[in-house]
Regions:
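Short, glycine-/Ser/Thr-/acidic-enriched flexible segments
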Residues: 1, 9-12, 22-23, 78-81, ...
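Extended, subdomain-level signal for the structured scaffold at the beginning of enzyme domains
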Residues: 56-143, 153, 227-228, 234-237, ...
Length: 334
């Protein structure tokens, strides 16, 4: 245009060119990423590669015997939980009735009182949502040990069993909550069991530190009522924040889960391919697994914080963030 001076132009390649000098974007990226590598070593040296992408399309969904216009959702807030308000807002926005129950642990009597309160309110709830955080300060070795111990209490265990087996209820756990569901056996087995070395687990990220970023996840199965408003193959952005999110299980078990549609979501790269690249699969999960379900799909666990969405967030990282899992859960009861 008249009066304007052209200072640069966009080309098809990924090089930055000034005069006779040319530098690749890959080289600049490496210089940026490696700046403090000698001080805080974190880069993975293994060659990144794509892994198998699973696909399971649901033909039908389970349905509760008793319908409910505004299902009640219990949200336990354990010592170290930091997502209960985000979770309650997401639940409320979807049309359900959230109730945050603070689990007190200052004294043994306080713990017992919390157990009794939760077990009592569980009898009239339709859903349980275990939010993320750093249960017990993630010590020792994190993975939601206090949450797991709480749910193994006889009264709470009985209430959860009744919710899932007799009242067609739903459960979900995100991040720390997912860790608890895994340790309890609720995913992938659908009930509280004594887990052993043959069960799947969530362990430390390969880079041995906390990861906090936006990742991309692909719907591998929409079998779960929580995912009934999604289509297999769709990709959603999701914020993650954890140090122990690496999903591990035997390949034999993973194949069985995939065959039954229990692998819900996988980390994917910019092309939508499941990958072990740490830039996209931040914890190096086997088969890039981000979330799994119980056999019937009514219990759902995932690492990414799908409750942390809202107007005005993540403006500088474009993508679809709304997996509509809470809306889908409410729809399940209508």
């Amino acid at each position: 245009a008249d009066g304007m001076e052209i200072v640069g132009e966009i080309t098809e390649d990924t090089n930055f060119v000034y005069g006779a000098e040319s530098v690749s974007a890959e080289k600049l990226d490496k210089l940026y990423e490696d700046k403090l590598e000698k001080v805080y070593s974190c880069n993975i040296t293994d060659e990144a590669k794509t892994v198998e992408s699973f696909s399971y399309k649901a033909e039908s969904y389970p349905a509760p015997a008793v319908k409910c216009a505004r299902p009640k959702v219990l949200i336990p807030a354990f010592p170290g939980t930091n997502c209960e308000f985000d979770s309650a807002k997401a639940v409320s926005d979807a049309g359900a009735e959230p109730e945050i129950i603070v689990i007190k642990n200052l004294t043994s009597s306080a713990i017992q009182s919390s157990v009794e309160e939760f077990a009592t309110k569980l009898k009239i709830a339709q859903m349980v949502f275990i939010p993320g955080g750093f249960s017990g300060g993630d010590e020792p070795d994190g993975s939601g040990k206090f949450i797991t111990a709480f749910f193994r209490n006889a009264a709470v265990k009985e209430g959860v069993t009744d919710l899932l087996e007799n009242r067609d209820g739903l459960m979900c756990g995100i991040c720390n909550g997912f860790q608890a569901l895994i340790k309890l056996g609720l995913v992938p087995y659908g009930k509280i069991i004594d887990t052993d070395e043959n069960c799947p687990t969530l362990t430390f990220n390969t880079i041995a530190r906390h990861q906090s970023k936006i990742v991309r996840t692909r719907i591998a199965s929409n079998k779960s009522p929580w995912l009934s408003l999604t289509n297999v193959g769709e990709v959603y952005n999701v914020p993650i924040s954890h140090g122990e999110g690496r999903f591990l299980a035997s390949e034999e078990l993973i194949r069985k889960l995939a065959e039954n549609g229990q692998i819900a979501t996988q980390y994917v790269d910019l092309s939508g391919n499941a990958t072990n690249d740490v830039q996209f699969n931040p914890n190096d999960s086997m088969f890039a697994i981000e979330g799994i379900t119980s056999p019937d799909g009514r219990v759902f666990g995932k690492m990414g914080h799908s409750e942390r969405i809202g107007s005005g967030l993540y403006k500088n990282v474009p993508g679809n963030y709304d997996i509509k899992m809470f809306e889908a859960a409410v729809k399940y009861f209508k």
